[in-house]
Amino acid sequence: MGAKQKLVSDFFKVDLPAYGSYDNIRKIASYVDGFKNSQRKIIFTMIKKYPKDYVKTETLANVCAAFTNYLHGAANLGGVVNTMAQSFVGANNYPLLTGNSGGFGSRITPTCAASRYTRVAQSSLLKSLLVSTDDAIIGQQLFEGDLIEPKYFVPVFPTLFLNGSSGLSTGFSQDILPRNPDEIIT
């Protein structure tokens, strides 16, 4: 048999904790910037590649997957982009991306149009949340020899409470409801 054998105890001591840690990074929003890994990759790509213009969601997802070495497929990123641009009641208090069509769902039907039909740009809030002078301090991560997005951003306002977050991961779950921005500031 040519397969490499591994002890079950080694799996539980090495592989399972490594998977759980990686899974938590993907599915639980960071308390520092309030973003999940995929959201951070999208925001980083928008800032670096599309600072002013609207871009087709499908194009953004493909460019983001290549630019940040996203391992889970551009189709997943397209859904995240569309969700970040939803502006109806009950979706986001303040969307970080702005959509230019009505294809981002509604309160009655929250599903978005396919990524090939929607276009997004940075919202004015996103531009004011992340200060470009922080870039030199934060630094970028290195993945397989390539510089990718930062480990976290440092927004001027706690975005985790602004739009909330929910996630289910290995050993952890997160359900943070959005808060009133006026109550957070005071």
State where each predicted segment sits.
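Catalytic phosphate-handling regions of large nucleic-acid enzymes and associated NTPases
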Residues: 1-186
